[in-house]
Regions:
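NUDIX/MutT-family hydrolases
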Residues: 85, 94-125
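Conserved N-terminal beta-strand and adjoining loop/helix that marks the start
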Residues: 1-17, 38
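A conserved beta-turn-beta hairpin within the catalytic core of GNAT-like acetyltransferases
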Residues: 26-30
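Conserved hydrophobic "DFG−1" position in protein kinase catalytic cores
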Residues: 11-12, 19, 86, 103
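Generic C-terminal helix-cap and adjacent flexible tail
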Residues: 1-2, 126-131
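Active-site-adjacent beta-strand/loop module that shapes the phosphate/pyrophosphate-binding cleft
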Residues: 60, 69-92, 102, 106
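The catalytic Nudix box helix
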Residues: 34-66, 105
């Protein structure tokens, strides 16, 4: 089974980070995740992330740096999740793929029902941003 390459944005506004709850009818419905999506052929990871955030959230961000990559095996295949630290001046208010958006403290991320692939990124974030 092929490895699907997916990008996500760890989007900061002030000291809060954006997480989004997947719509019930989507795979992993009800789970929270960092927003993003699949990398399309011919796109760089960064181009994919900027496109996905505009498509899903109508949100323009500034990518600050690559953060962390993780591979997760789901029942129907594996994804490589590539995360980037981003900043925004805007506030996303609605999403095409999510039914709820929440700005949360990094230290509180593991209190949410995160998608399994997002948990290692959340743990690394908490480690990096504590204190």
């Amino acid at each position: 089974m092929d490895l699907i390459k997916v990008v996500c944005g760890i989007i900061f506004k002030d000291d809060l980070v954006l997480i989004c709850r997947r719509k019930a009818e989507k795979s992993l419905g009800g789970y929270w995740e960092f927003p993003g999506g699949k990398v399309e052929d011919g796109e760089s990871n960064e181009e994919s992330l900027l496109r996905e955030l505009i498509e899903e959230l109508n949100l323009k961000v500034k990518i600050k740096q690559h953060f962390f990559d993780t591979v997760h095996q789901y029942d129907n295949g594996a994804i490589e999740l590539i995360s980037f630290i981003c900043e925004t001046e805007n506030i996303a208010s609605e999403s095409t793929d999510h039914d709820q958006l929440q700005w949360v403290k990094v230290s509180d991320l593991l209190d949410w029902k995160l998608a399994p692939a997002d948990i290692p990124i959340a743990k690394k974030l908490i480690e990096e941003f504590k204190g």
